[in-house]
From Swiss-Prot:
PANTHER family: PROTEIN MIS12 HOMOLOG
Membership in a protein family: Belongs to the mis12 family.
Sorted UniProt keywords: Cell cycle, Cell division, Centromere, Chromosome, Coiled coil, Kinetochore, Mitosis
Protein name: Protein MIS12 homolog
Assembly mode: Component of the MIS12 complex composed of MIS12, DSN1, NSL1 and PMF1. Also interacts with KNL1, CBX3, CBX5, NDC80 and ZWINT.
Domain of life the protein comes from: Eukaryota
Subcellular location: Chromosome, Centromere, Kinetochore
GO biological process per UniProt: attachment of mitotic spindle microtubules to kinetochore; cell division; kinetochore assembly; mitotic sister chromatid segregation
Species assigned in the record: Bos taurus (Bovine)
Pfam families named among the record's database cross-references: Mis12 (PF05859)
Cellular compartments per GO CC: MIS12/MIND type complex; nucleus
């Protein structure tokens, strides 16, 4: 079988020429085997009609297999020549012929320098895309951080509103007075706690 991939021919036919030849070879080989089996059966029937025949079916089978090997060798030799003719003259697209989908290359051909330039430009665009993607990810991460900060700020403002409401409930006119009131009460609670702790220690000692 040919080792040439013949990719352009495969693009046109939809299959590789080598695959086509292989299928033809298998079909011929199967037909040869079937013919030899049929011939063997005919010979065996003829021998059954001959009285006291010294030729056994085993000998017939050996002769059939030997003849089959001979025919297969001749067939392989002939098929190899036929395959070369098919692949060179019938299933091959001439080098000066373009497929319809490639006709644009006749008027828009590229030199090797232009190809390398386009390849370099593609690489630059890929790098630019990667950079923009990283920038986008960084902006999204920053946006998430801003959302967290905004949520904490909202929570802090809500706490200040609660403190202001507590101050108003106790007679403070604004947030500053309410904060002073809370600080004073906090100090009072701290003093009470210290006194309780001292009293508890004194009772333990006594």
């Amino acid at each position: 079988m040919s080792v040439d991939p013949m990719t352009y021919e495969a693009q046109f036919f939809g299959f590789t020429p080598q695959t086509c030849m292989l299928r033809i070879y298998i079909a011929f080989q199967d037909y040869l085997f079937e013919v030899m089996q049929a011939v063997e059966q005919v010979i065996l029937k003829k021998l059954d009609g001959i009285p006291d025949c010294a030729i056994s079916p085993v000998e017939i089978r050996k002769c059939t297999e030997k003849f089959l090997c001979f025919m297969k060798g001749r067939f392989d030799n002939l098929f190899g020549k036929m395959e070369q003719l098919f692949l060179q003259l019938i299933l091959r697209i001439p080098p000066n012929v373009l497929l319809p989908e490639d006709k644009s290359q006749e008027t828009q051909s590229y030199s090797e320098e232009e190809f390398h330039f386009l390849q370099k430009e593609i690489e630059q665009l890929q790098e630019k895309y990667k950079t923009e993607l990283c920038t986008k990810q960084a902006l999204l991460a920053e946006l998430e951080e801003q959302k967290i900060v905004q949520a904490k700020l909202k929570q802090t403002l809500s706490l200040f509103d609660e403190l202001e409401n507590v101050g108003r409930d106790h007679g403070a006119s604004d947030f500053r007075e309410g904060l002073v009131f809370l600080i004073q009460n906090s100090r009072k609670l701290q003093n009470i706690r210290e006194n309780v702790e001292k009293e508890g220690k004194r009772l333990k000692i006594s």
